[in-house]
Design a protein with these regions (language model features):
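Solvent-exposed coil/turn segments that connect beta secondary-structure elements
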Residues: 7, 41-42, 76-78
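Non-catalytic, surface beta->alpha helical segment in thiol-disulfide oxidoreductase systems
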Residues: 19, 60-103
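Hydrophobic beta-strand anchors of alpha/beta hydrolase catalytic cores
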Residues: 1-2, 36, 71
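Short active-site neighborhood of thiol/selenol oxidoreductases, capturing the structured segment around
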Residues: 1-10
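Typically the conserved alpha-helix immediately C-terminal to a functionally engaged Cys/Sec
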Residues: 12-29
Length: 103
């Protein structure tokens, strides 16, 4: 799962990180079912140029509109499976959504 985030300016991104990405039940599920990659686009913090180039390339392919947070489910072959709309929900609710999409 690819997560486009603005870690120091995007309030919904910060919420998603705290409520979902940091939750132990989600981390357990993700460890067994997903490869997680967060492409972070901070405004105040600098990231290394090579990493920024990789994130820009991912954004061009999977987030051309520049939506934040943008949650993208990809196959192991990097095929787009689904865009997952951000909603404030519980970790269990988000896990249920992912399980449905992974079937």
């Amino acid at each position: 799962m690819l997560v486009f985030s603005g870690s120091d300016w995007c309030i919904p991104c910060i919420r998603f990180n705290k409520q979902i990405l940091s939750d132990s039940s989600f981390l357990r599920f993700a460890g067994e079912n997903l490869v997680l990659l967060e492409a972070d686009f901070p405004q105040r913090k600098k990231i290394a140029a090579p990493l920024r180039q990789q994130y820009d390339s991912l954004a061009a392919a999977f987030n051309p509109e520049g939506a934040f947070p943008q949650l993208v489910l990809l196959s192991p072959q990097k095929k787009l499976l689904a865009y997952i709309p951000y909603r404030e929900e519980t970790p269990d609710g988000f896990i249920t959504t992912l399980k449905h999409l992974l079937q």
